[in-house]
């Protein structure tokens, strides 16, 4: 595997995660394909398109405060111009005065476009959320 492609894909994922955690949702737009698909937990539905995708991040950032956030077990696989990145996450946040604990695995698919990795598909797997 081309290690530089792998490292650049991992860097794109870090950039996306840092931007939304810092509330800079608009910064995600250039890193997300216009027709990105996000599958909801347990595959109960999906959204398609950058506008709807970013709206979910915007809603969370406007209405929740992250108190703790951790990632581990990141795996980055690259084949040609496609990268699949997964990682476990754990987060504690407050929304509408209530404190929540959530954990699971995030799965992102990236496609190389014009020498940059662009997110094209996302699913949140094994997600568990409960009052904290």
Give the location of each predicted region.
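A short, structured loop/turn motif at beta-sheet edges
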Residues: 76-83, 110-116
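Short helix-adjacent coil turns
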Residues: 16, 20-24
């Amino acid at each position: 595997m081309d290690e530089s492609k792998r490292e650049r894909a991992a860097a794109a994922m870090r950039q996306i995660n840092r931007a939304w955690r810092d509330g800079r949702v608009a910064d995600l737009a250039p890193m997300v394909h216009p027709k990105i698909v996000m599958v909801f937990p347990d595959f109960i539905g999906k959204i398609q398109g950058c506008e709807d995708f970013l709206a979910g991040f915007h809603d969370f950032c406007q209405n929740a405060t992250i108190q703790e956030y951790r990632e581990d077990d990141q795996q980055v696989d690259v084949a040609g111009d496609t990268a699949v990145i997964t990682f476990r996450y754990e987060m504690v946040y407050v929304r509408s005065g209530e404190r929540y604990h959530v954990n699971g695995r995030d799965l992102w698919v990236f496609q190389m476009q014009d020498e940059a990795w662009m997110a094209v598909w996302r699913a949140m797997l094994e997600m568990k959320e409960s009052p904290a």
